């Protein structure tokens, strides 16, 4: 899994994304070892929880129209850790494509690829949910990480990060360039992302199950809380359309600073 040399024109080109994704998947356990029925039940409960959370959060916030818009336009996915890695790599690549970078050579690309792979893997065991808003239309678009992905990447906001450790849970997903798997392809709970045009909301089934078991939480309460938390961020993005572009701009400033510091 050695990165191949390529001409560097943006920060995204400093990373071999296929290798970074494979590295992340290779070091990350799939999740808790549980029966297939438990995996399916976790996925179904998260789907039911987010369906109820959007109108509930809209009523609480006094933003019912934004909640309805979010429900109609967002991609809402229940993913495994491999799916989260793939989705996170896709938005990070597009985000970094908006930042200029010098050619640091093959050695620098190898190091950067390993670092990104390590971060993607680490985050995939700790996030319970994540909202990825579409980038502002002003952002330059690079080559998509996944040929099937829609134009426009998404910086991550609204993370929930427990200190979670786990064993084996869901399928590691499909090939590195594929859309993130929904649920568990080994047990029939599997679907592909749809073509909706809004933000993407991810619920990470193995991490929700792991933290619920470790802390002995109510089987209904934790999925409901995670769904309500992420639904609130989704509604915020719909109520304030400028917010996604602002977040992307701030993240590019951070990426640009990191690239400059590494020269």
Model-derived regions: residue spans:
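A metal-dependent hydrolase signature that marks the N-terminal structural subdomain at the beginning
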Residues: 2-133, 160
